[in-house]
Amino acid sequence: MYKSRLQELCQQRRWAPPEYTHRCAGPAHAPLFGATVSVNGVEFRTPEDAARSAKEAHNIAAKAAFDHLSSLPLPPPPPPSENQSSYKSQLQIYAQKKGKLLPSYQTIREGPGHASRFKSVVTVDGKAFESPEYFHTVKEAESAAAKLALMSLPQEASSSEQVPVQPLSYKNLLQELAQKHGFSLPVYSTTSDGSVQVPMFKSTVVFQDGSFQGEPANTKKQAEMNAARVAFQHFEDRRKNALSSTVLRGPHLGQGTVHISAGQVKIAEPVFSVPLASTATSHSATGATDRDYHSLGSTNPLPIAKSTNCADVHIQPCEFKDEKPAFPEPKTVLEVMDSSPELTPLEDAYSAPVASTSTVSSSGCGSDPLASASTVNSTGCGSVPLASASTVSSTGCGCSLLTNRVQVYPRRPDLVLPEGATVLPFSDDVWVAVSLPTLNH
């Protein structure tokens, strides 16, 4: 049959299938038929009375078309299939380098089932590109759409120099963070979503009692990397916020003073937790000279009593400047517990160590002498007496505290309070005041 041979010829030449029409002439009991066939835009007709049936007329027209078309030279061969597939491969490589979703193709079909033509629309990086014309196969249509997309996208994308730098391995960074701080290792959970051709993965990592979900990705490895990046950046931001708050919040200077008629006791709190220094100013019989010393790291001068002659130093009786009535109250001891830093003199090179603990004890408020006085070494005028504890005895001076004994400590994370100690309400961010049971003297 020439109809089948003509059909094969059209497929070889990549033409559309032939289209047939027929005509009927003559009486109804003896009709005669003629046919017309259209192949690649050219029509071939038979005479009006060429056949007694339409099928025979179609075959005669197909023979005429086949004889004419088979004598024509063959068209140039189509481009190799590998060139067509290379456009799709290049477009897929571009999307992977850019970290985008893989290209998706949508096919548009036109014409009857036996003579269909196809167009393709490819979507990449949120942009759609349609093939410029219809093709006889889906493969050709997709290749044309991919070629158009590659030509329309930025040209630098195809250059080997534009290959992005390998991103940081956030999975390794998160694991190093866990090992450094003794945390449990991160646990990843990945789910797959989307079609088989274009799979999508979502990953969630559980780390330090927190769950972090990353952006979807085309591969499981990239999805886990995205989740690890979210978790790592969360802990990095929290660490930076903690550092900035620590720098901005500094200890505030505070000073508490108890005024005494013949002496003064100061509790100074220098900047950045420089240890306290308690000073007592004494007046000797022949006169005394006060010299100022600075504690290292502090701008507050600390007055130190220094005798300039060899006479014995007599400490005058003291009384509190307080308007409260003198009722007998429990004995009160105030201690500042800390180590004393090195002191540097302002005027000369006298060496004057300062006691690390200053104690003010109360046993009387009148003219009673001090219960325990500082030891004075009068062997020479150039030496300064050392005082391990200055004790002032006073009772019933109108000064009352919650308990019998108070100690002040610098606030530290590793601070351990003595047994039975109670934190007092006037403690702050720098110092901790605690009350202790009565001392047994």
UniProtKB/Swiss-Prot annotation:
Instruction: Give start and end of each DRBM domain.
Output: 1-71, 86-155, 169-237
Gene3D superfamilies in the cross-refs: 3.30.160.20
- Drop me one GO molecular function for this one: double-stranded RNA binding
Pfam families (alphabetical): dsrm
Q: Could you list this entry's UniProt keywords, alphabetically sorted.
A: Repeat, RNA-binding
Per its database record, what is this protein's job? Binds double-stranded RNA.
The entry's protein name is Double-stranded RNA-binding protein 1
Task: Supply the source organism's classification.
Answer: Eukaryota, Viridiplantae, Streptophyta, Embryophyta, Tracheophyta
The protein's gene is named DRB1
